[in-house]
Amino acid sequence: MMRWNFSPEDLSSIFRNNSTLPKITVKNVDIEFTIPTAVTIEVEPSPVQQDNPPISSEQADFSLAQPDSPSLPLESPEESESSAQQEATAQTPNPPKEVEPSPVQQEFPAEPTEPAKEVEPSATQQEASGHPLKSTKEVNPPPKQEIPAQPSEPPEKVELSPVLQQAPTQLLEPLKKVECSPVQQAVPAQSSEPSIVVEPSPVQQIAHLCLQSSLRKWNPL
C-alpha cells in the first residue's frame, strides 16, 4: 500500500496550477426544523375496549355495593332445619306417609276359620253362580302379608288376586260341605293356589256300586 502525504501548501499549489478544475460554489441552505414543544400522542382504542361499553358511575357504585351484601340470605335455625328435612324427604323415593292395610288383609284375619261372609261377588262370580259347577273348589286364603317398616310405595290401589276374582259364590258356603281327604287338607295349608276336590261322575259311581255288590256276593261277610 502506497501512502501519499500532502501538506496543505501542496494542495493549494495543486489547485492553483490546475485550471481544468471546475469552479464550485457552495451555497448555504437554510434548513428549518420545527420541533413541537408538546408531543400529542393519539392512542386508538383496541376492538376489545370498543366492545366493552363505558360503565357509568351509578353502575360502578352498585357493583361496589354488591360484595358487601351476602350471596345467600341468612336463614334462621328453624328454617334451616325445615329445609334439611325437606331435602331428606326429597331424597327418599316414597316416604311412608300413611300405610293403610290392604283389603285382602282386612277381609282375612290372622287365623281364618271360616270364609268371609261380607265379600260381595264380582261380575264373574255372579255369572258363575248362574251355571253351577259340578266340582267343588276349596279356596284357602293367602297368608297375612307383613307390612314393611318403610314400604317403597304406599298401597294406594290394591287389586284383588285372580283367585278371588275367579272364585264362584261357593266361597259363601261353609267349608263343612266340602269333603276332602286328610292328605289334601295338609298339603294346601301353605300354598296360595286352591285345592280342587273332584267328585266321581255318575258312571263311576254306578261302576263302583256294581263292584261292591259283586264283592258282597262273593264275600257275604
From Swiss-Prot:
Q: Where is the stretch described as Disordered? A: 40-162
Low complexity bias (residue ranges) = 82-92
The disulfides recorded in the entry are: none
Please name the InterPro entries in this protein's record: LRRC37 (IPR015753), LRRC37_N (IPR032754)
Positions with biased composition (Polar residues): 47-60
PANTHER family linked: LEUCINE RICH REPEAT CONTAINING 37A-RELATED, LEUCINE-RICH REPEAT-CONTAINING PROTEIN 37A
Protein name per UniProt: Putative uncharacterized protein FLJ43944
The source organism is: Homo sapiens (Human)
Organism phylogeny? Eukaryota, Metazoa, Chordata, Craniata, Vertebrata
